[in-house]
Amino acid sequence: MGTKCYSKLRYVVVLVLLLFVFPCSLSQSAPSSVTGRRLMGIYMPNGGIIAGSSPSGQAPNINNNYHGRRLMISEARPSKSKKGGGREPESPG
């Protein structure tokens, strides 16, 4: 009978410790709006999409001169290889 009470006491002690530790850890964690981490990228009209938060938790400084990592380029440029691949320009006549 003594071992039965001891095993129940062990479960009660573990339960009390979990009830004490779990709320303390929740109160110390800050929401994403406070830490500055973003889940989505930032769209810039002339520059594509800038990637969101980095794995280290330090988001890049965003200003007008910062272009970040480009995920999408929104402008088409002519080929520099001169090998074609596009349409021939139509003659005006």
From Swiss-Prot:
Single GO term (MF): LRR domain binding
Disordered, as annotated region: 52-93
Family: Belongs to the serine rich endogenous peptide (SCOOP) phytocytokine family.
Subunit relationships: Interacts with MIK2 (via extracellular leucine-rich repeat domain); this interaction triggers the formation of complex between MIK2 and the BAK1/SERK3 and SERK4 coreceptors, and subsequent BAK1 activation by phosphorylation.
Positions of short motif SxS motif essential for MIK2 binding: 54-56, 79-81
Annotated motif SCOOP motif 2, positions: 73-87
Source organism: Arabidopsis thaliana
One GO CC annotation: plasma membrane
Conditions for induction: Accumulates upon infection by generalist herbivores such as Spodoptera littoralis. Induced by wounding.
Protein localization: Cell membrane; Secreted, Extracellular space, Apoplast
Residue span of motif SCOOP motif 1: 48-62
Alphabetical keyword list: Apoplast, Cell membrane, Cleavage on pair of basic residues, Membrane, Repeat, Secreted, Signal
Known function: Brassicaceae-specific phytocytokine (plant endogenous peptide released into the apoplast) perceived by MIK2 in a BAK1/SERK3 and SERK4 coreceptors-dependent manner, that modulates various physiological and antimicrobial processes including growth prevention and reactive oxygen species (ROS) response regulation. Inhibits root growth.
Name of the protein this chain belongs to: Serine rich endogenous peptide 6
Gene designation: PROSCOOP6
One biological process term in Gene Ontology: response to wounding
Tissues showing expression: Mostly expressed in seedlings shoots, and, to a lower extent, in roots.
